[in-house]
Amino acid sequence: MYPLIPQTGCKVALLFKQLGIRNVLWLVMAALTEQKILFHSESFARLTDSCTALTALLYPFRYCHTFVPILPTSLIEVLSTPTPFIMGVHSMHDRELNEVLDTIVVDLDGGAVTLPENYTIYKVWIHFFTHIYLVIRYNFLIF
């Protein structure tokens, strides 16, 4: 039996509104390919909602790596782990964010997604990305 569809309220819609279709699709592809994803914001609620929304978008798959929507200051060195993760940190840690390597950094306040230099996307993902982008953009007429 399949797990229940995740109940997110308006969290998924808010993620699309904050980041746009293209950036959210980049994040979904990154999560599916086991990349490190780091959200940062001034709002703890926005961090939690965005991390939860991203994992909900993976349905019917489940995210099985490290998931910490709000990383405490005392554990900030965990960001240098080599394993995939989805984590959120308060924006007051800007200095530490500049030192994070091989990580996709998501600025929820500015609506920007920064991909690492070594991040490559395979041709099969380009086709998937383009198709899904067009379906969302033209059939649902959002953003």
Question: What are the roles of these predicted feature ranges?
Answer:
Residues 1-143:
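Acidic, Ser/Thr/Pro/Gly-enriched alpha-helical scaffold modules and adjacent low-complexity linkers
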